[in-house]
Amino acid sequence: LTPINTRTFYWVSQVGMLAGTAVYVNAGTQLARLESLSGILSPGLLGSFALLGIFPLLAKKLVGLIQARKVYAGWPKPARFERNLVVIGAGAGGLVTAYIAAAVKAKVTLIEGHKMGGDCLNYGCVPSKALIRSARFMKTVREAETLGIANASADADFGRIMARVQNVVRQVEPHDSVERYSKLGVEVIQGHARITSPWTVEIDSEAGKQTLSTRAIVIASGAAPVIPKIPGIGSVKHVTSDTIWSLTEKPERLLVLGGGPIGCELAQAFAGIGCQVTLLARSGIMGKEDADAVALVEAGLAADGVRLLKGLDTVRCEIVEGEQRLIVAQEGTEQRVEKALPFDVLLCATGRKARVSGFGLEELGIPLTKAGTIEVNEYLQTRYPNIYACGDVAGPFQFTHTAAHQAWYAAVNALFAGFKSFKADYRVIPWVTFTSPEVARVGLSENEAKALGIAHEVTRYNLDDLDRAIAESAAHGFVKVLTPPGKDSILGATIVGEHAGELLAEFTLAMKHGLGLNKILGTIHPYPTWSEAAKYAA
């Protein structure tokens, strides 16, 4: 069973079991000496049973110390530390980590090589939702006739819309600014960080290079968009979800690669402000969601003018007579018939990859997962127990709220590991795709429950029966709840429709605190509101 020599295996096993054997034999000896009921309370017996309980914990701690000593071998430990914690990256994960450390008066340094706030503030959540707001207003204007309003019209000024997007980012910036975190007690350094040992971080900033010694390090370097390796892509105008916000002129023809949440949201938003949008999703859109949810989103995309193409392989990019084109071919066919898709701008939304290069991880031998994220344990520790990772760089989720969630565990464990450590809890993770209609989910989907072999019942409430939805001419979508057979505890909930993201919070709260559908049913919901959908589903 093992490559160890039989004799070696035998004596190592015997020696390894000596301590445990001694503890158990001692407990048995004490039990054998019992002569009366009063003997149960004897110090010897109580001590023996206490040792039985404590021994596994002590053994686990000892093994951990031995493993740590082996990992740290060859790295000189500083005699003193200048910081309690150094945080690399000022996105959601890094900001929350630094905030928590400052709140307990720890000496913490936050290092950011680019913009405070990370991708969410500057390129992701905030700008995309600002753009979606403009697109949804244009949709309201187009549907004004259904509300009894005649001759409504509006022109989408692309330049002004993009300027508003940047203005929204500027309004949110103070929440994540250097000034705010400095006032909280965080030392913020704008520069590039490199881990040079388990306890030292080298910082290259405008002021020059410096090295800080620290008891613990948290890596929160985030992720970056992946640009697909398509022949000729470098010769055409292509952008990512990070760089698209620099556009100042409207792309008349926008070709979007990728059918994930980012691709779907941006495709629909740009279509909403007047772009001709083609969405190329090889395996279909939103692969993690159930078919009934996907069908409604596909209908919403089509209604807003998005042309959805599935089952196509990308072959190459080319420019013919000044026209940029993506050449595609039908997936899986022997005789590949090529087809040209002309575009003005190509948006690559084919996923994001953890930022792991340039931080010294290779030199320290910190391993990565198959997904390219930093390998961490349940406490978010890397190979080195005092080096942690959280957010997109650690996975498995790429959401701002999960980065902040992980940051609490990373910060607390980094600061108090000697006293108490906490395992990161991923049991109740909500997420929302901000298409029209929105798709919001927490817990299991039907597909996941079936794949895992989990017995379940499905309760479905269609929003075309909800009075408020009918009043707003938005009576489309559903609330779907999975429960164990014959029980009301919630395994998962999926909501598709207007305000789905807001409605999901009630189910998230219920799952987090073990509240079943009967508790939701027994709660008064004001009439007429969207929140009643949760009660009717219950």
What are these regions (language model features)?
Residues 88, 102-114, 126, 130-137, ...:
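Flexible, glycine-rich terminal cap/loop adjacent to redox cofactors
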Residues 26-73:
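Multi-pass membrane proteins that catalyze or facilitate reactions on polyprenyl-/lipid-phosphate substrates
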Residues 234-250, 341-420:
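FAD-site-proximal beta/loop scaffold in flavoenzymes
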Residues 125, 221-276, 280, 304, ...:
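Glycine-rich dinucleotide-binding loop and its adjacent helix/turn
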Residues 81-83, 207-216, 334-345, 383:
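Core beta-strand elements of the Rossmann-like FAD/NAD(P) dinucleotide-binding domain
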Residues 83-110, 263-272:
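N-terminal Rossmann-like FAD-binding beta1-loop-alpha1 element of flavoenzymes
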